[in-house]
Regions:
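Alpha/beta enzyme core
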Residues: 6, 11-60, 67-83, 91-195
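Extreme N-terminal starter segment of soluble prokaryotic enzymes
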Residues: 1-5
């Protein structure tokens, strides 16, 4: 089951990231604190992502990032009783699935699951076939939530949002489709949601 009201936990810069402050315990403690606040506020689930790791790798983060996220998400899971989600930015769905499998997280977010999007990391190509097979083998109970026309990106010409959403649900096997605005903090418009 994918929660409908999900609180977001943005991890501060992790070890190996350019803006890492050198205190990993503080990063984890902040995530745990945020999780407790969001649980008390009534959120149905929590999504945890490495938001502080700018600039992002396109689709293959360092192993240190995977290890740090696994530890942080494990600690958050020990502190709250909500279903957890994992997003490894910018688009490392394989790492997100591995972290989810090892921490017991319920779902992952994939910014580009199918097709291609043009981002500040360059073109990112979805790997739905690889992720579907990895999920079947490693974590069949982990839900995949996928963005359609993800924020901070542009689709190729000629592709409509309706087409992309149908492909995500029908052919890429996404369990849920996420519609975001054009950038973080800018929600999608009502006409876009109606499409």
């Amino acid at each position: 089951m994918v929660p409908r009201v999900i609180g977001m936990i943005h991890l501060a810069a992790l070890p190996g990231s350019p803006q890492y402050g050198g205190d990993f315990a503080a990063v984890v403690d902040a995530a745990v604190s945020d999780a407790k606040v969001l649980e008390t506020a009534g959120f149905e689930g929590l999504m945890i992502e490495n938001f502080g790791d700018v600039p992002f790798y396109a689709d293959d983060v360092p192993k240190a990032t995977v290890a740090a996220m696994t530890h942080a998400i494990g600690r958050v899971g020990d502190a709250v009783s909500l279903p957890l989600g994992v997003n490894v930015l910018r688009n490392d769905a394989a790492a997100a699935l591995a972290v989810a499998a090892s921490t017991g997280a319920a779902f992952i977010r994939v910014n580009v699951l199918s097709g291609v999007m043009y981002t500040d990391q360059g073109p990112i190509i979805g790997r739905a076939a690889e992720i579907a097979r990895m999920r079947a083998a490693l974590a069949p109970n982990v839900a995949v939530m996928a963005d359609v026309f993800v924020k901070h990106a542009a689709p190729p010409p000629g592709i409509t949002i309706e087409q992309a959403a149908e492909e995500l649900a029908g052919r890429a096997l996404a369990d849920a489709v996420i519609v975001s605005g054009t950038s973080t903090g800018r929600p999608p418009t009502l006409p876009l949601l109606r499409k």
